[in-house]
């Protein structure tokens, strides 16, 4: 038991390090640009910051959605312990993504966000995804699970439309080459399709068990 706990702690430490590595690298490169005007973030540093943080938010969201299929395929229930932290990191990167847009792109004129939401569909769906993520992040604790009871599970089913909105945000943002958003759309389709298939299979199994056997002729 102690060995398992130690392994989980070590694995969580690695996950934390891996999840924080992209933002640490981005922060270091931003510092270089700020201090020396280097091209560490390319010709358009603001666009690069927004792109990377948004991309990692989407990646971590998809990894979070992959936890349940991974548990079902491997039978390793321990992977569920990583779902909450991965989901919180997805929200963290999404928040940094939004903050970068507000502070670096809009340059602090935050009231323009409402005009942008109405004018640009990709911002509309992206902002909607972030708003839906917020209650999931807030209620991710054990205390909220106890308070909400069955409603907690219903609330956290919002992760599915959030995934769709996030992919759609990326798809609409890209103007020409849609190969990358198409890849993430395909991954999301597989993850959601797996859940639909498992649910239908469970219903069929339940129906077969509840169907009485045919009467034998006397």
Curated annotation (Swiss-Prot):
InterPro entries: Fe3_Rdtase_TM_dom (IPR013130), MsrQ-like (IPR022837). Its main location: membrane. The keyword Electron transport applies. The chain crosses the membrane at residues 14-34, 60-80, 86-106, 121-141, 155-175. Keywords: Cell inner membrane, Cell membrane, Electron transport, Flavoprotein, FMN, Heme, Iron, Membrane, Metal-binding, Transmembrane, Transmembrane helix, Transport. Belongs to the MsrQ family. The gene is msrQ. Its cofactor is FMN; heme b. It comes from Xanthomonas axonopodis pv. citri (strain 306). One of its GO terms (biological process) is protein repair. It is a multi-pass membrane protein. Binds 1 FMN per subunit. It is found in: Cell inner membrane. Heterodimer of a catalytic subunit (MsrP) and a heme-binding subunit (MsrQ). One of its GO terms (molecular function) is electron transfer activity. Part of the MsrPQ system that repairs oxidized periplasmic proteins containing methionine sulfoxide residues (Met-O), using respiratory chain electrons. Thus protects these proteins from oxidative-stress damage caused by reactive species of oxygen and chlorine generated by the host defense mechanisms. MsrPQ is essential for the maintenance of envelope integrity under bleach stress, rescuing a wide series of structurally unrelated periplasmic proteins from methionine oxidation. This is Protein-methionine-sulfoxide reductase heme-binding subunit MsrQ. GO terms for cellular component: plasma membrane.
């Amino acid at each position: 038991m102690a060995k398992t706990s130690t392994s989980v702690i070590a694995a969580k430490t690695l996950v934390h390090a891996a999840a924080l590595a992209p933002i640490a690298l981005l922060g270091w490169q931003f510092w270089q640009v700020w201090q020396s005007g280097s091209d560490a973030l390319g010709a358009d540093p603001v666009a690069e910051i927004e792109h990377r943080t948004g991309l990692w938010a989407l990646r971590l969201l998809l990894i979070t959605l992959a936890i349940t299929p991974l548990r079902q395929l491997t039978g390793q229930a321990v992977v569920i312990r990583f779902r909450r932290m991965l989901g919180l990191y997805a929200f963290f990167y999404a928040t940094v993504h939004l903050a970068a847009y507000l502070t670096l792109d809009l340059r602090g004129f935050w009231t323009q966000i409402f005009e942008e939401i109405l004018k640009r569909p990709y911002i509309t769906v992206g902002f909607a995804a972030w708003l839906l993520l917020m209650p999931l992040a807030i209620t991710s604790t054990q205390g909220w699970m106890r308070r909400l009871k069955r409603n907690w599970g219903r609330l956290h089913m919002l992760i599915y439309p959030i995934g769709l909105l996030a992919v759609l945000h990326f798809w609409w943002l890209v103007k020409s080459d849609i190969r990358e958003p198409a890849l993430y759309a395909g991954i999301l389709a597989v993850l959601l399709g797996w859940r639909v298939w498992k649910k239908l299979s469970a219903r069929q199994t339940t129906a077969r068990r509840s169907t009485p056997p045919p009467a034998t002729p006397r």
